[in-house]
């Protein structure tokens, strides 16, 4: 093609030269427009001022909307309340080191104050201990420097991580901490296992809580489910560090490891737990759901043929609400029973005031007129049967021993 036959170069849109010069045209040679492809025609139309088509507008609009949809969608997902909460958490974390310094300063100031009072009491001829107790009264809580481990295992099943919200997961973490504390400081305690410890719950303990759980003594965390944890617990209880048959088990010295059983505790069970047995494993559901998933623990156990039972709250306590307890309350009640062997007293020392728990009148009369050892036998005869649901009509489920776990796991895998 010769120089004079070539079309003029099309100038870019928006340039000042394009507006000052004469209108530009394409196809200086006849028939050139017909020879061009549709794509080239479209491109050439976009390059001509005022020649933009509807298709070009449609292609530009989604691009602009895509660029603006991202931030709007993000803002819709995060509410103002969540933003404020996140800001508070960031502020709390930022001042962590500052709080440590303040605590150390307060501790040092308190020690210095006690030392000054001690010296002052000695100069005045007074008893320093009495003077210090007046200003710094000792706590009345009983502390046991050394606990006695019993051949009994408590497993907290945390396999409900996907069913909980973030705030419920935070609450469960607090309940696990309190459960460990109650079991650890008790005069008689059992083996404590946290099963299905994974996903977001584990992430919270390792990040927000700075792995403080790794320093807990007498507790084991495992990613396995509660059924596998129960099998391993049976082997541990038979070992040299399995525990001693003392305290509440001192009259069961003839108990054998094969007599132990596995029980999943749930308020939906028709069977009531009467006592804790040596070499047995009790599973507690680690779920905080505000009763959204009712009966899920009971269903989980019955599908595998595991025995279920509920604490005897209805026999001793008059409740103002549904007898569903937090995980740490269940652990505390069982630990207190190991010390007292008295369900009524264990409930009264553990239940929070908001539950409105009070001893039933029939139980009060029993405790006043009947020796502590005979309370259980009188209860079975029907002394308090009028105020509790009839559980004798339901035949207790056959106990599952640790030997049966392999068969249960095989059936679970086959399904």
UniProtKB/Swiss-Prot annotation:
Reaction equations catalysed: guanosine(9) in tRNA + S-adenosyl-L-methionine = N(1)-methylguanosine(9) in tRNA + S-adenosyl-L-homocysteine + H(+)
Annotated compartments: Cytoplasm; Nucleus
Catalytic class of the enzyme: transferase
Polar residues bias spans: 34-46, 62-73
Domain SAM-dependent MTase TRM10-type: 140-358
InterPro entries: MT_TRM10-typ, MT_TRM10-typ_sf, tRNA_m1G_MeTrfase_euk, tRNA_MeTrfase_TRMD/TRM10
CDD domains noted in UniProt: SPOUT_Trm10-like (cd18089)
EC number from the UniProt entry: 2.1.1.221
An individual GO BP term: tRNA N1-guanine methylation
GO CC terms in record: cytoplasm; nucleus
Positions in coiled-coil regions: none
Residues covered by region (Disordered): 1-84, 354-415
Active site (UniProt): 289 (proton acceptor)
Binding site for S-adenosyl-L-methionine: 265-266, 285, 289-293, 297, 311, 323-325
Any Pfam family: tRNA_m1G_MT
Disulfide bridge positions per record: none
GO molecular function, one term: tRNA binding
Keyword field: Cytoplasm, Methyltransferase, Nucleus, S-adenosyl-L-methionine, Transferase, tRNA processing
Origin superkingdom: Eukaryota
Biased composition (Basic and acidic residues): 361-379, 401-415
Subunit structure as annotated in this protein's UniProt entry: Monomer.
Summary of the function given for this chain in its UniProt record: S-adenosyl-L-methionine-dependent guanine N(1)-methyltransferase that catalyzes the formation of N(1)-methylguanine at position 9 (m1G9) in cytoplasmic tRNA.
Family: Belongs to the class IV-like SAM-binding methyltransferase superfamily. TRM10 family.
Protein's UniProt name: tRNA (guanine(9)-N1)-methyltransferase
Origin organism lineage: Eukaryota, Fungi, Dikarya, Ascomycota, Pezizomycotina
């Amino acid at each position: 093609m010769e120089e004079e036959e070539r079309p003029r170069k099309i100038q870019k849109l928006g340039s000042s030269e394009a507006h000052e010069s004469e209108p530009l045209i394409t196809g200086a040679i006849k028939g050139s427009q017909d020879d061009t492809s549709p794509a080239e025609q479209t491109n050439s139309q976009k390059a001509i001022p005022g020649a933009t088509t509807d298709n070009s507008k449609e292609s530009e609009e989604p691009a602009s909307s895509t660029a603006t949809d991202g931030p709007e969608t993000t803002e819709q997902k995060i509410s103002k309340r969540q933003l404020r909460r996140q800001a508070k958490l960031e502020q709390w974390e930022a001042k962590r080191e500052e709080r440590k310094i303040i605590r150390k300063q307060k501790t040092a100031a308190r020690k210095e104050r006690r030392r000054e009072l001690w010296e002052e009491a000695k100069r005045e001829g007074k008893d320093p201990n009495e003077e210090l107790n007046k200003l710094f009264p000792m706590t009345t809580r009983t502390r046991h420097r050394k606990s006695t481990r019993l051949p009994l295992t408590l497993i907290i099943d945390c396999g409900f991580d996907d069913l909980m919200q973030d705030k419920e997961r935070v609450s469960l973490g607090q309940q696990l901490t309190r459960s460990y504390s109650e079991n650890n400081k008790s005069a008689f305690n059992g083996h404590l296992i946290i099963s299905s410890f994974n996903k977001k719950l584990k992430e919270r303990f390792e990040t927000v809580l700075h792995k403080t759980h790794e320093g807990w003594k007498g507790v084991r965390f495992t990613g396995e489910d509660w059924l596998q944890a129960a099998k391993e617990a049976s082997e541990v209880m038979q070992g040299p560090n399995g525990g001693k048959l003392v305290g509440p088990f001192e009259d069961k010295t003839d108990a054998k490891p094969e007599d132990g059983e596995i029980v999943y505790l749930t308020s939906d069970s028709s069977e009531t737990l009467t006592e804790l047995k040596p070499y047995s494993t009790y599973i507690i559901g680690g779920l905080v759901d505000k009763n959204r998933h009712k009966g899920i623990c009971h269903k989980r156990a019955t599908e595998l043929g595991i025995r279920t039972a509920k604490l005897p709250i209805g026999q001793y306590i008059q409740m103002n609400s549904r007898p569903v307890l937090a995980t740490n309350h269940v652990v505390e009640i069982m630990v207190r029973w190991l010390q007292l062997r008295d369900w009524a007293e264990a409930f009264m020392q553990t239940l929070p005031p908001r539950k409105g728990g009070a001893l039933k009148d029939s139980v009060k009369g029993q405790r006043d007129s009947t020796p502590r050892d005979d309370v259980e036998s009188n209860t079975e005869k029907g002394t308090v049967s009028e105020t509790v649901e009839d559980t004798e009509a339901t035949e207790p489920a056959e106990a599952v021993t640790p030997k049966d776990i392999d068969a249960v796991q095989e059936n679970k895998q086959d399904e």
